[in-house]
A protein has these predicted regions:
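Short, glycine/charged-enriched secondary-structure capping and boundary segments
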Residues: 20-22, 65, 87-91, 175-179, ...
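Active-site acidic short loop of glycosyltransferases
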Residues: 158-159, 196
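N-terminal Rossmann-like dinucleotide/flavin-binding domain of flavoprotein oxidoreductases
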Residues: 85-155, 231-242
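Glycine-rich beta-alpha-beta "Rossmann" dinucleotide-binding loop(s) and their flanking helix/strand
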Residues: 152, 160-189
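Rossmann-like dinucleotide/flavin-binding elements
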Residues: 1-73, 77, 187-234
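Glycine-rich nucleotide phosphate-binding loop and flanking beta-alpha elements
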Residues: 58, 138, 168-170, 208
Length: 242
């Protein structure tokens, strides 16, 4: 644990939209109630907050920081909400737990991927939030503040840091011959691409089952390979559809 640095979103171990939004907002709320934290004190080049990542958790933190009037900067390596943008076409959205209202201002109503993207954009980008496109290589503690190292840029200094980079880029490899083939994918963009093709989906979580269901519905012949005899991780709706 590093005082003043907060990890939010998927990296906390719960990859659900509402939990991601909740952790982002609560991190900033915790900063605001921290008796040690003093905003806008000391050198003007030191920001109150730096947010790394512009996914659901990072954007939720940004909304909370702006509402509180903090000086902040947000960095995103690819594009805002990249994980959601890269969901399969027309992927169904389940906002579990249904009764949960996450901390902060971000809300979820959409039931398919495209509507969710539009909904998220409307709540953030359309409201003037503009993350800086840059990859943060590392974060170092320097006394009472942090320094963010960014290639080809001057280091950025901040009193507090929120890390919401997600886990979508860290896909697990099987360690088997042939997995580097052009026929092997770690993400499904459009299931229509697999019409009338034989497809092996490896995995037993929601992503794997949703990919298998979508490909089958679009005319693909699908086999699911899972290391357990039963599915216990996916949502009941996905198991029923399979």
């Amino acid at each position: 644990n590093i005082s003043g640095l907060y990890v939010v979103g998927d990296l906390t171990g719960i990859p659900l939209l509402k939990f991601s939004a909740d952790t982002g907002a609560r991190a900033v709320q915790h900063i605001l109630t921290d008796g040690v934290f003093q905003r806008d004190k000391g050198p003007v080049e030191i920001m109150d907050l730096a947010i790394v990542g512009a996914g659901v958790s990072g954007m939720s933190a940004t909304l909370e920081a702006r509402k509180a009037g903090l000086s902040f900067v947000q960095f995103e390596a690819t594009e805002p909400f990249s994980t959601v943008v890269n969901f399969p076409k027309e992927k169904p959205i389940y906002t579990y737990p249904t009764e949960m209202v996450p901390a902060g201002d971000m809300r979820f109503v959409a039931q398919i991927k495209e509507s969710l993207v539009a909904e998220l954009y409307e709540q953030t980008l359309a409201q003037g939030i503009e993350p800086t496109l840059a990859r943060v290589e590392r974060v170092e503690k320097r006394g009472d503040h942090f320094e963010l190292h960014i290639p080809d840029r001057e280091n950025v200094k901040a009193r507090r840091v929120v890390i919401g980079i997600g886990r979508s880029g860290n896909f697990r490899k099987l360690g088997v011959p042939g997995e580097d083939s052009v026929k092997v994918f770690n993400r499904l963009h459009d299931p229509v691409d697999f019409d009338d093709k034989d497809v092996l989906v490896v995995g037993g979580g929601d992503s794997a089952l949703e990919a298998a269901i979508a490909i089958a519905q679009c005319g693909g012949r699908v086999t699911v390979s899972y290391r357990e005899p039963d599915f216990f991780r996916p949502k009941p709706e996905n198991v029923e559809k399979l």
